[in-house]
């Protein structure tokens, strides 16, 4: 977001290519260490993940490399240069069978490969990063691909659209999550945070 342009320098992103953008395979510890040692960032924000829930079931090894080993590598590198690590996680670290919201003090109980690999990533961050923020978010949406845009597109080509109606959650704006990250990284309030917008829908 442009409002942060004055005090934040973006080094890496997984959504853009071109001049001034450096790509990084977070599953490659040597590549991660090389770049982080060269750049010496104050803060590393990890938004990378294999988020295709069904795909994670079919590609466990890849999901584990990206969702668990990647965060581990970033945590090791962050500690090496004294950087803070912001790790974006998910509500899928919980089974999702309860009707009431979960807190940061509840014990994770993932049932999907996605949730299990994301939880392992969290555990690696807690083990290897000295200064970390783990933000569990849910139903994230932004200007890119999102559920609402998908449904509008599908509705234009289908007379009837079927979706699940027994799931409840709090749709969370990517902009609001970015504001939360920006706020937290300026503090020393390390730990696990549940970061979603208010409200509930299904």
Model-assigned labels for residue ranges:
Residues 1-6:
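N-terminal Rossmann NAD(P)H-binding glycine-rich loop of SDR-like oxidoreductase domains
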Residues 15-30:
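Rossmann-fold cofactor-recognition segment
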Residues 26-66:
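NAD(P)H-binding glycine-rich loop region in Rossmannoid oxidoreductase-like domains
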Residues 44, 58-86:
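NAD(P)-cofactor binding segment of oxidoreductase domains
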Residues 65, 70-73, 84, 93-135, ...:
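Catalytic helix-loop patch of NAD(P)-dependent Rossmann-fold dehydrogenases
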Residues 123-171, 175-183:
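NAD(P)-dependent short-chain dehydrogenase/reductase
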Residues 180, 187-202:
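Mid/C-terminal beta-alpha module of Rossmann-like enzyme folds, strongest
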């Amino acid at each position: 977001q442009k409002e942060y342009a004055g005090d934040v320098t973006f080094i890496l992103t997984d959504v853009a290519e071109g001049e001034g953008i450096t790509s990084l395979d977070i599953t490659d510890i040597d590549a991660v260490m090389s770049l982080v040692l060269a750049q010496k960032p104050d803060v590393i924000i990890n938004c990378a993940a294999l988020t295709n829930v069904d795909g994670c079931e079919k590609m466990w090894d890849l999901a584990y490399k990206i969702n668990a080993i990647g965060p581990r590598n970033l945590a090791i590198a962050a500690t090496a240069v004294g950087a803070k690590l912001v790790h974006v996680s998910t509500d899928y670290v919980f089974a999702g069978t309860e009707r009431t919201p979960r807190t940061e003090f509840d014990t994770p109980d993932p049932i999907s490969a996605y949730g299990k690999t994301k939880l392992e990533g969290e555990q690696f961050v807690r083990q290897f990063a000295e200064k970390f923020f783990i933000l569990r978010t849910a139903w994230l949406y932004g200007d890119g691909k999102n559920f609402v845009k998908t449904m509008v597109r599908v509705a234009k080509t289908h007379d009837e659209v079927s979706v699940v109606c027994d799931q409840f959650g709090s749709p969370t704006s990517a902009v609001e999550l970015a504001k939360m990250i920006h706020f937290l990284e300026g503090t020393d309030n390390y730990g696990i945070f549940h970061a979603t917008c208010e409200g509930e829908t299904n």
